[in-house]
Amino acid sequence: MDVTFLTKNVQINGTQFKILLQNGQGECALIALANVLLISPAHARYAQEISRLVRGKETVTLNELVQTLADMGVQNPNGTDVDKQQLLQILPQLYSGLNINPEFNGSFEDGVEMSIFRLYNVGIVHGWIIDGDNDPNSYEHVSKYSYMGAQKVLVQSYEIQKNNAQFENSEQIQSDAPYLKSFLARSATQLTEYGLTHLREILVERSYAVLFRNDHFCTLYKNNGELFTLVTDPTYRNRKDINWQSLKSVNGSQDSYYTGNFIPTSLERTETTATGQNESYISNPFSDQNTGHVTSNQVNSGASGVQQIEDDEELARRLQEQEDMRAANNMQNGYANNGRNHQRERFERPEKNSKKNKFLPFNGSNKEKKRDKLKKNCVIM
């Protein structure tokens, strides 16, 4: 049976769109990419096929989505040299698990995975960045690494300490490892305060991108200088008032839900007034429409409503904190588990050269760039 995705009708800044929702796989790169193409005005000209695919449908299959994106890829001005069959092979990986490698200076290690986003002219960003302004010492030790590179150093450091292993750069490994371990522990959500600021700077107002965070991918949008992620959880499919979640904090403690027009909302369902003109969480006893006397029951009901909203928001924060804890535990345990001999052998073997797969345009010169310079001049349109 083919994998399927539910669709949802949303209104964003007064315009109607249909988006795709995640399934049990979670927030995957395929859905994040597809939704940018579906709702971004900058991509409307080249995204007519995917818009036709979802129009009038309650569900879309993985095969339909991949076939449509592949057709769009070869027709895209950036895809003149693209092999459709090879594109059909890699696009499903955006659903099953995309192997990307964020670098702690704000960029990504280049490769075929990055070329997918270039093909569709969709930016991919992350905020897992070390703060070079307030912690220059840590920046010197951390910014030159990617996540996979950091894991390799931690494994090698473990081998040096436990098994007296020797590497060509053992001194450098032992010097950098404590800073890397500390940084990973302090950024369990794969997002830092400095990274949040960086994201606000590089995204143009009312622009879209794909955000990598917590080993997941989501559709990111900038509105009035603030960042929002598209809500694709099928739990909220019937909630027309929940379309966005703000991205104001690294742990979700300050994040809240918004309508498609960026009006704050709540997990609690809103109730329509008798006139059908207004929606509110609590009826206003001082409204001109309330011609009766205000009773103690009304006041208590209002207070209960406020408490329910706070409880719902606290639940959302706790769920986010649990996810952050899970990610932190995975990272803390990962480097030790990888210290087994077969992992050591894998790290010591020459890495596979991603240039060999030439089915997509790939600029391998990224390896030669200056890693100690944060890409603040890279603006996502």
UniProtKB/Swiss-Prot annotation:
Cellular-component GO terms for this entry: cell periphery; cytoplasm; nucleus; plasma membrane
Principal cellular location given in the protein's record: cytoplasm
Transmembrane residue ranges: none
Keyword Cytoplasm listed: yes
One Pfam family this sequence matches: MINDY_DUB
Subcellular location: Cytoplasm; Nucleus
Bias kind Basic residues: ranges: 372-381
Biased composition, class Basic and acidic residues, residue ranges: 342-354
Misc: Present with 7620 molecules/cell in log phase SD medium.
Full protein name: Uncharacterized protein YGL082W
The species this protein was found in: Saccharomyces cerevisiae (strain ATCC 204508 / S288c) (Baker's yeast)
